[in-house]
């Protein structure tokens, strides 16, 4: 089940995290945006702060190289959440189609060349979705969050082992999304 109060509370921060997981630009590390969106009570505050502190040691071109090496050339940290989740391309294709329809159902128009399981796109969807009064919201938002949960689990562990800067962003995301779910008793989410 979705904790809609927390989802509403953290929507803007999901957009901020999405920005951190896109190819880095100068505004990616804008301190004013960070301070405006992420306050000390945010569940991922310490992780995002650690990420910023590590990245501030590098130039923008070095950060872009770190990003490319991490996400474009490694199968252990794909930004496509279903990349390692399905046994066949057919199964993955069906999920991609389902996500695309889901986004359109809630008014998000995708760019033609983007896959619907791209993490930043999924977070932008959660940031902008208007669910109030829509009976389809709970099931569909839960699907998106669970795909992100599954897709980031291995990535969080791999990047965490390396003390990789982007590991902090993934941990902040997972902590935030965990609070957006109301987990039934007896069921546990991965940390």
Question: Which stretches of residues belong to each language-model region?
Answer:
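Charged, alpha-helix-forming regions
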Residues: 1-191
């Amino acid at each position: 089940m979705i904790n809609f109060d927390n989802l509403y509370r953290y929507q803007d921060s999901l957009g901020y995290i999405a920005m951190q997981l896109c190819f880095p630009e100068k505004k990616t590390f804008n301190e004013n945006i960070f301070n405006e969106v992420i306050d000390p009570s945010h569940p991922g505050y310490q992780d995002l702060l650690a990420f910023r502190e590590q990245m501030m040691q590098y130039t923008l071109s070095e950060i872009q190289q770190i990003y490319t090496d991490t996400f474009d050339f490694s199968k252990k940290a794909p930004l496509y959440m279903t990349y390692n989740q399905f046994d066949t391309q057919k199964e993955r294709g069906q999920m991609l189609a389902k996500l695309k329809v889901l986004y359109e159902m809630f008014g998000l128009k995708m760019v033609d060349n983007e896959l619907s399981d791209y993490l930043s796109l999924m977070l932008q969807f959660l940031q902008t979705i208007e669910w109030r009064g829509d009976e389809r919201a709970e099931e569909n938002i839960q699907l998106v969050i669970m795909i992100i949960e599954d897709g980031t689990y291995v990535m969080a562990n791999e990047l965490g082992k390396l003390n990789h800067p982007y590991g902090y962003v993934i941990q902040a995301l997972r902590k935030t999304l965990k609070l957006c779910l109301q987990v039934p008793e007896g069921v546990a989410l991965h940390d």
